[in-house]
């Protein structure tokens, strides 16, 4: 039987301040409101407090304290998700990973990178591309979403057609468990047959099994050239038949997207109106 969660009190606030400093503990109305929503439509749950640790040690101490006091913790990143995964439905603590935002190491020899979960997807992609390396997962919010959130949701984008999604590029994770224990889930190798596959268990778990504090990503060589084609079809059926024909011909496009005439007309109209004003 699940015990009733405890409310955050003054003693709890003082304890959090002692762990991470008063500048990283927030309980003002404006901050609580900002962290009560993500991009999920018409959902809002207010936390009782927002805390912003900077490393796994601080997170471990916070989790141990909350575990002892039965205070719920909801980890969050950039809050760009559409499934409500970062919403504190039980109140309690919202733990933001935004200060864990370092690209720790780029291992060009082994095509790997070690990063913290608060790094923005596009910032990471641009960083590795300067070294002729490629991190393919490209969710629609890549300009603002955090890599930690991508892991929590197993995010992907149009390029998943050829390259796969987030889970296909994760080698190893540092995770703080609900007990406060800090573990690594795997090894920095492509083939690892030792024990349970804890790395993939954590990917897509939406913060319910632990808080990810470091990630080792696999990278691939940057494609030398990209070509974009726009092909009109007289019907949706013909477009779908073309997709099947492309794959049967042995071609593997990076992405394929379908646009209806109404959508194209709307974009054209908006572009025209922008020039008129």
Give, region by region, the residue ranges found by the protein language model.
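Glycine-rich N-terminal segment of FAD-binding domains in flavoprotein oxidoreductases
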Residues: 30-100, 115-117, 136
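Acidic, glycine-rich loop-and-beta core segments that form the ion-binding/anion-interacting portion
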Residues: 263-265, 273
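Alpha-helix N-cap recognition
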Residues: 55, 235-238, 277
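FAD-binding subdomain of flavoenzyme oxidoreductases
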Residues: 102-106, 111-257
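Generic non-transmembrane alpha-helical segments
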Residues: 11-20, 61, 65-69, 127, ...
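N-terminal accessory segments
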Residues: 1-39, 68-71
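Active-site beta-loop-alpha junctions enriched in small/polar residues
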Residues: 259-261
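Conserved small/polar residues in nucleotide/adenosyl-binding loops
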Residues: 270-277
């Amino acid at each position: 039987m699940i015990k009733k969660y405890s409310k955050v009190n003054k003693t709890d606030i003082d304890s959090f301040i002692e762990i991470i400093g008063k500048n990283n503990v927030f309980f003002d109305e404006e901050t609580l409101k900002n962290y009560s929503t993500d991009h999920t439509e018409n959902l809002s749950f207010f936390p009782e407090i927002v805390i912003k640790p900077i490393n796994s040690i601080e997170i471990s101490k916070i989790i141990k304290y909350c575990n002892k006091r039965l205070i719920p913790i909801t980890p969050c990143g950039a809050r760009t998700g559409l499934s409500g995964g970062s919403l504190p439905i039980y109140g309690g603590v919202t733990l933001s990973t935004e200060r864990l935002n370092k690209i720790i190491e780029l291992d060009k020899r082994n095509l790997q990178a070690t990063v913290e979960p608060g790094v923005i997807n596009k910032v990471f992609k641009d960083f590795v591309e300067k070294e002729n390396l490629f991190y393919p997962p490209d969710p629609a919010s890549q300009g603002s979403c955090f890599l930690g959130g991508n892991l929590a949701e197993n995010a992907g984008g149009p390029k998943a057609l050829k390259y796969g999604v987030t889970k296909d590029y994760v080698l190893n994770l540092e995770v703080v468990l609900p007990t406060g224990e800090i573990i690594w889930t795997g090894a920095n190798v492509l083939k690892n047959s030792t024990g349970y596959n804890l790395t993939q268990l954590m990917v897509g778990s939406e913060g319910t099994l632990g808080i990810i504090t470091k990630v080792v990503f696999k990278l691939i060589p940057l494609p030398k050239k990209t070509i974009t084609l726009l092909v009109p079809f007289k019907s949706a059926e013909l477009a779908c038949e073309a997709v099947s024909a492309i794959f049967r011909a042995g071609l593997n496009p990076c992405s394929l997207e379908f646009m209806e005439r109404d959508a194209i007309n709307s974009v054209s109209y908006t572009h025209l109106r922008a020039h008129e004003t």
